[in-house]
Each structure stands twice: as C-alpha cells, then as structure tokens.
Amino acid sequence: MGLKGKVLITDEGHFDLTAYKWDDQLFSDILAKDNQIESSKAMDISRFLQKEIADMENHTITLPIIDKLLQAKLVEYGLTQTSHIRLDKSIFIKNGLKLSDNALNVLKRRYLKKDGKGKIVETPEKMFKRVAQNIAKAEKKYGNADDVKKMEDIFYNMLTELKFLPNSPTLMNAGRKLGQLAACFVLPVEDSMEGIFDSLRNAAIIHKSGGGTGFSFSRLRPKDSRVGTTGGIASGPVSFMKIFNTATEQVKQGGTRRGANMAILRVDHPDIIEFIYSKKNNNELNNFNISVGVTDSFMEAVKTESDYDLINPRDGEKEGTLNAGEVYRELVKQAWENGDPGIVFLDRLNRDNPTPALGEIESTNPCGEQPLLPMESCNLGSINLAKFVDYDSETPSIDYKALKDMVWWSVRFLDNTIDMSKYPLSEIEEMVHGNRKIGLGVMGFADLLYQLKIPYNSEKALEIAEQVMGFIQEESHAASKQLGDERGVFPNFD
C-alpha cells in the first residue's frame, strides 16, 4: 500500500520499497513481542504507521522518521515504558511470492500457522520470516550476536526467492512451541519384546513431532524360532513391521500428515524371501518403504550364481542357504512390479561411515538418501537449481558463482538448525549434537536442463549432473571446513 517509488534510507544503504509492503500483523507482532501491549492497540499502531508512511509526500523515508511517529503514538496510548523497538528494513516484507494455487493449498493445509480454531494466521512470507528469524538465532551461540540480523536477512531472501528450502518440519515448527526441525531419524530395533515396543513408542513420538523413521529389523530372530523366556514361537520381523505400520497410520506427523518409515532387512536374514514379498499386496505396509540390505559378498555370489548362507541373528548360527542369483531375480521382479523393495549397499555405506567407533550404519531415513546410525537424526535441505541460470550471455549457462554462495549459506543454515531444533528423545539429541550431520541436496534439475535447452535423456544431461553435483559436494565440504574452523569440529570427531 503506497510504497511504490519510495526509498528507505538506512545505515546499510538505500532500499527501493517498490517490491515491498507493510504487513499490519508483522509489525503488530514486533510491538507485542517484548512489551505488554494489548494486541488491539498494537494493531492500531501498526495500521497508523502504515497509513502515515503511505501518505508521505517525500519519496525517501528514514528510520528516525518512522521511530518519531511510533514514539508519538506510544505516548498517545500511554505506553511510555516500552522496551526499545529496533527498526530496520525487516519491518517491510516482500510482496507476495509467486506461488501456484497448488503450492498455496499445500501451505494452507500443512505449513502455515493456525490459531486454536484452525484459522490460518500467517502468510507464506510470514512463515519464511518466522523460519529465518529462528534459524539465525543460532549465531548467538558462537559469539556472533551482531550477525543475527544479517543472517536473518540472508536466510529470508534464500527462502522467499525459493532458491533453498529446508525439510518440512523446519517450515512447520521453527519459531513455534514444538520446535522439532529434523525430518529423518533412525531407531534401533532390539530382539526382545521390550526393545521392539520401546522402538515403536519412540517412533510414535517422532512421528507426532513431524519426523520420519528408519529401522533395521535385521536383529530380530526369524519366524518360528524358539522364544526361550516363554517357550513360544517367534513371529518374525515382517509381523512386527505390520504392527509398526498400523501405529504409524494412527499418528499424524506434527498433526499434519501421516508418518513415513523405512524398513531394512539384511539379505542373509532367514526371513528375507518373506520380506521381499511383504508388499506384494498393495494394501499392506503402505506406510513403509522397504529395502534389502545387501553385502559385497552377496553381490559377488550373484555374479557367480553361487549359494550363500542365511544367518540367525539371535545366535549367529547358519540356518540355511539360498542361491544368490535366484534371490536377486526375485528382488528385481518384485521391485519391477510395485517399486519395492529397494537395495541398500550396507558395506558401501559403512566404508564411508565417518564415525565407525560409534557403531555400524544399518538403516537410512524413509526416502533412503540419508544413512544414519541408530538413535541419530538429520536435517535436510534442497537447493533449487532452476534458480541458478545466467541469461547475461548469448547462451544460457549455470551461474556457478551464485550457486557457490547458496551452497555456503545453505550449509550454515542447516548447521544452525541442529542448534535450534528441539529433539523428541535425549539419546537422539546427544547423538545429533555429537555428529552434527546435515543433508544438502537439490531440486529443479529438469527445469535447469530445460532452461539450458539440454534434453533430459541425453549424455550432456548426465555430464551436467556430474559437474553440478561435483561442484556442490566440493563447495559444501569447503563450507563445512570453514564452519569447523569458526565453530570447532564436531564433538565426536576424535
């Protein structure tokens, strides 16, 4: 309202307000945040300032002028004992984001803050402001209190320009009471009734807070094994997966969506064939992705069509043999028919395990891209490659300078998220703060290729994929190293 052609002058520089707007609720919230001001009065003051700024004849606006108007209004309301209210360009927010109707509907349904009656009380811009403010506060922990506002602005611009987006729990929960910001967790499943249902309970808590869970059921004794304590017969891993699936059905993630799980079973578990076909009926285990944990020795046996041993995890004894080639073909056939199971290369994962002294990696997050130790969690985020095309030259090209900057800021954002997140279990908090893993990925690759006029199914596309991901990996490692120099190495480094 009335900001077109106006310029805000601050110590940081001159800012054209044409692309910005005054948001009544945002400034009202700023007023009420550190002062005992009734919400109705705070809103009246905010609307007063909006009108005064819009009606100004001068095209230049300074913060002292706004402050003078604010102080006069506070005196009028008898609010002379208020805390100092810092004014800067963040009191204006960017005009509406260019979001599709579908995107807006998803935001309204799952992400935007609602009041006790279910009424939406924030815009997409305010959601991003809430997230940016919360994540930037982590700078204080490292003695960078003066950088909080700077980082808030950088993070806000990243988000509103849709160049980077964090995982859903960060958008949902940052700056709110729940405060659980991580998307993916891995929980151990021990071979006892207590261990199994402890894991189920923990999974329910995580799902309620907005996270997804990965499990390895490989420690569970196979079906029809003797249970020493009762003299009964074990029902096997797949039966307990069904219990986990049913529980997941009943718990919405963060009160907004159903939970998600990953189940992994080692290829040498005696129940591996039952596991491979556990999702043959498409109405079962709908809250699980499943993957077979294969080993190097199994893959070698596949090449030679050799038999391999099945091992009972309860006692480590051989319980039978199967032909590796036949098992592999059964796996591929079932994956072709309905998409599950996938394959996880366990030995390959553990060769890259950065903290082998803490244990073996035996599972991943629900989508499979993030291997984690038992009782470990991770924050994820994605860079939107479609936003990094340079049109200044005759032929569109990738803007690697801008991409480098975004990688570095994204790494910092995700590292800050570790400190700002609340964790559903103390064991997870300890592991996360000890290892400080983050997951930085990409989206918009097809859109990038379209802008570069490169066919998706071409050798050139593969070449671009390798170049871009190699660049992102190299720069993210460099950014991580700088954070290590600045903040210290992660506690479990030694």
What are these regions (language model features)?
Residues 1-494:
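Extended catalytic cores of very large enzyme megasubunits
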